[in-house]
């Protein structure tokens, strides 16, 4: 996660080199006003706007005037205000500081998610129909099935919807329009534990603490570190292992 963020920032900085390599306008050409008439002006503006949006999104503070000056000086081939070694030191410090900042933000988010998840599960366990297991897994039987229960080596076919504790849906078989099929042991631990308790034909709502989901790592999208997850699972069928 940290490396991706640092790489993204470094890529943004590297794009200034791309500007110098691709733009053909003379370095002394005055900046356009509100009108962009040539392809070069449109390209230059697009690259600048894209960089600006990315810097803002990542919380990176820069001086647009100093950046424009550096771009102009680099393209002119004249004397630069900093030596190559000085610029290298500046960029290395920037990456180090950014990594530390992102790491602190990530750890803070992980602690917040963990606390919110624990509070949710603590309240949820007292709700009618909710069963709490020693592992921390919770479930509520919405529809009882009478089929076979799978083992960890069996293959199951399911329909499901996954959401965060705030109700945000992050995945669902409804998106693909078809059920999912996989081996019971090849999913997150909370799923593996719950599925082995479910008779085929059942529909359960399963509440999975972060340590039985993706833990402190972030898997991208809306699932952050230490997220408690909720799944509505309909176990359609079980294919017994040949082993």
UniProtKB/Swiss-Prot annotation:
For this protein, the record's InterPro entries field holds:
INFPOTNTIATR, PPIase_dom_sf, PPIase_FKBP_dom, PPIase_FKBP_N, PPIase_FKBP_N_sf
Q: Catalyzes what?
A: [protein]-peptidylproline (omega=180) = [protein]-peptidylproline (omega=0)
Q: What class of enzyme is it?
A: isomerase
Q: Give its E.C. classification number.
A: 5.2.1.8
Q: Does the keyword Mitochondrion apply?
A: no
Keywords annotated in UniProt: Cell outer membrane, Isomerase, Membrane, Rotamase, Signal, Virulence
Subcellular localization is given as: Cell outer membrane
Molecular-function annotations in GO: peptidyl-prolyl cis-trans isomerase activity
Gene3D superfamilies listed in its UniProt record: 3.10.50.40, Peptidyl-prolyl cis-trans isomerase, FKBP-type, N-terminal domain (1.10.287.460)
Signal sequence residues:
1-20
Primary localization class, coarse: membrane
Activity regulation statement: Strongly inhibited by FK506 but is completely resistant to cyclosporin A.
Q: Which GO terms describe its biological process?
A: protein folding
PPIase FKBP-type domain location: 153-243
What family is reported? Belongs to the FKBP-type PPIase family.
What function does the entry list? Answer: Essential virulence factor associated with macrophage infectivity. Exhibits PPIase activity.
Name of the protein in its database record: Outer membrane protein MIP
């Amino acid at each position: 996660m940290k490396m991706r963020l640092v790489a993204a920032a470094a890529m943004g900085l590297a794009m200034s080199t791309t500007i110098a390599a691709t733009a053909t306008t003379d370095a002394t050409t005055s900046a356009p006003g509100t009108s962009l008439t040539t392809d070069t002006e449109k390209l230059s503006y697009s690259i600048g706007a894209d960089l600006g949006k990315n810097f803002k999104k990542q919380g990176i503070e820069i001086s647009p005037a100093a950046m424009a000056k550096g771009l102009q000086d680099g393209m002119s081939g004249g004397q630069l205000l900093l030596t190559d070694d000085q610029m290298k030191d500046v960029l290395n410090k920037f990456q180090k500081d950014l990594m530390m900042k992102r790491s602190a933000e990530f750890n803070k988010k992980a602690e917040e998610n963990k606390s919110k998840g624990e509070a949710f599960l603590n309240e949820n366990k007292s709700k009618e129909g909710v069963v709490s297991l020693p592992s921390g897994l919770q479930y509520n039987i919405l529809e009882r099935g009478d089929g076979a229960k799978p083992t960890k080596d069996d293959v199951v076919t399911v329909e499901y919807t996954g959401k965060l504790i705030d109700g945000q849906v992050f995945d669902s078989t409804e998106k693909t329009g078809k059920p999912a099929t996989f081996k019971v042991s090849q999913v997150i631990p909370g799923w593996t534990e719950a599925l082995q308790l479910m008779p085929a034909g059942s529909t359960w709502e399963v509440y999975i603490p972060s340590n039985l989901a993706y833990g402190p790592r972030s898997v991208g999208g809306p699932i952050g570190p230490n997220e408690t997850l909720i799944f509505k699972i309909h176990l359609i069928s079980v294919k017994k292992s040949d082993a």
